[in-house]
């Protein structure tokens, strides 16, 4: 098999080979239609003339006429063929793109499927011709139609005639019988073969490969191609060399592109590389352009190299190698900034593709994972590799090579750390800025109060931080895992000393410069399981801790003399980021966003007084970023007053809770004890936060400010006493069932006579009971009441007095009525119920819009056929006044009876409510009195409404 792996420089065709055979078919069909229908059609306007469908429908009708003539002349042969029987309806005046044009094209498609039995594989749709897409199927459909029509005497294009000629040659070679239907056809002159072989050799000889694609001539127009010796038929169609492929045609140029490895750009047509013939493979590399390059074995001598420069060039060969750990380490450790020219990637980038491909054949072992990465390195530009800011060589260091460099001398690994810190400075500045921008803007207010003080200290202590970091950094860097690992793309900077130097330079630039230098790349450290010793720079890269996640441990943040919450929270991040001198330091990470805390075993074992205190001079620039808060304006004296008032109030509240829980509800001792413990803890916290260093007052953590003028005497006494009594029993009152609970006839008189006296007596007893309960509560509590509680009690008393006065007036009016009407009212009240009436809306919509039947009395009906009439006679309305008087009397009596019964039931409910000794009974009495007035108003309204209706009826 040939070993061609390239392509030619110049195209062997005037246009794309995939469209050349379509152009040849279109040219042949245009000439065929021009001769047959005398149309001015060429290749350029082929679609424009046929898109309205009229020419296609005419051609279909013409084929049908030829089929009918053939059936008349050759009836015995017509039985073996499928002939069309009907034509196509068409519209000659159809405009392109209109619905009439679409109808013409649709009729032609249906005729092809039904009458000519053309398969859907080579059929087209209406949209293909209207929108000029899928041109290939349109041309194939016309060729198939011409092929089928040529069987019964229809003139055919040149391609169909060449097909018939080739079929005749095959029949003669295979000694097959001749065609059964010798139908006379109008033939056209075919092209001769005198220039065919010359044109074929011209196309094939353009390949400059040492071993060319074989194409051997068997006879005129017949060749054997490739190593498989496939027999193909070649013909000349005007200016194109056509090849008979399967059931269709193709150009020779396109055929060579698909089958010749020199032209083919697909990986499926590439020959497999054999390990046994490596020496032959090197010399058989195919390129089109020649270039003199130095040889690999002897640079003084030059050799000719063929360089591939075609747009459809094949990809470099993919080599599958087995994994080798030693080779991985040598490849990954060989990339450095100083040895760029000596590295394999740099050499491969300078050598031409020919040498690079030949070099890659000799290697046998490579990791499957590294093949993709090293492939990108081979195709890298040399200038891009030389640039220290953008290159892939930094990302392919293995952990084993990094460990071997770290375990060397201090000079070597400090130099490497300097290189990495300088090359990754832009990334880390961008990362800090992005992390700061993502933080929430709202934080605790007291952290911002210390920000101004920290800024003053930072300028004086920056040099101290650098010196301490240099000393600590050299002692804390250790390598605990030197096992060979897979090459990691994300590198951990090894030297903390240079990082601190870079951190100091970064502080002076400011936050605004960091925002401008944002980059999309990020720096990640390796797993904390594999490498527990982290550097100062990596801790600085972490996300700042939120105040809610700070661990207030007594073993870490307690002072002997003075301890401030502001110092604890402000210097928490610095204690987290400070490297420890001890070798037992461990790093704890709970996630990406959680703070990292260093636990020192030696410090935790020491007593509280011996533990190291947080130093104010160790603040850094990261604290400024964490403490971006807006301070609240407050004086130190105001803070002292606030803390004192809070302490006094909490103490008094705890005492009140203890006293109330012992006297009233001994079951809640545990809850009171828990609240007492909580109060003591809050007292400790408030006392600790009240102490601030350097005479500065801190802001409370909760951010709540209480007025110092407030009296802290009895703040929770009434609330606690009310809650300790338990749930208060309330009386359920159903307003709707008042009328149904009317007493019997005999009890109405007794209730009417004794009603007035009972209300007065009950009112006096209720007031006495209320005064007694209030006095006992005031004596038992012996505490001052809040203004809101006093106002509430006064409001309740006023409500009760007003309700009593209203009830007395209502009862007096009821008793002042005539005693003669009472029996009649009682009789009427037992059988009557309040009339239901709907509330009239403000705007009544049209009856016909609501689709309701209008309930209006019909007018006079004078039609003679409608008898008797629906309109009542006016005589019946003359007796209305006598009826109206009776109706009015009955309604007034029922109204009086309902009023008496409602008042009686209301008094009973009031007496029961007063005896229950409920302080909130005034609210319920107001609720009782309100429905009474509401009941009165609808009745009077109904009475007036009924009168107006009767008056209107009498007027009619």
Curated annotation (Swiss-Prot):
Mutant lacking the gene: phenotype: Morpholino knockdown of both gas2l2.L and gas2l2.s resulted in mosiac embryos and impacted the number and distribution of basal bodies on the surface of ciliated cells. As a result, ciliary orientation was significantly reduced.
GO biological process: actin crosslink formation; microtubule bundle formation; protein localization to microtubule plus-end; regulation of cilium beat frequency involved in ciliary motility; regulation of microtubule polymerization or depolymerization
Composition bias type Polar residues, residue spans: 332-353, 381-390
GO cellular component terms attached to this protein's record: actin filament; cell projection; cytoplasm; microtubule plus-end; stress fiber
Subcellular compartments: Cytoplasm, Cytoskeleton; Cytoplasm, Cytoskeleton, Cilium basal body
Keywords tagged on the record: Cell projection, Cytoplasm, Cytoskeleton
Extent of Basic and acidic residues compositional bias: 859-868
SMART domains, per database record: CH (SM00033), GAS2 (SM00243)
A GO term for molecular function: microtubule binding
Pfam families associated with the record: CH (PF00307), GAS2 (PF02187)
Location of the Calponin-homology (CH) domain: 23-150
Gene3D superfamilies (UniProt xref): Calponin-like domain, Gas2-like domain
Major localization listed first in the record, in broad terms: cytoplasm
Domain GAR: 191-263
Region ranges (Disordered): 332-361, 378-406, 853-885, 914-956
InterPro entries assigned: CH_dom, CH_dom_sf, GAR_dom, GAR_dom_sf
Bilayer-spanning residue ranges: none
Protein family: Belongs to the GAS2 family.
Function: Together with gas2l2.L, regulates ciliary orientation and performance.
Name of the protein in question: GAS2-like protein 2B
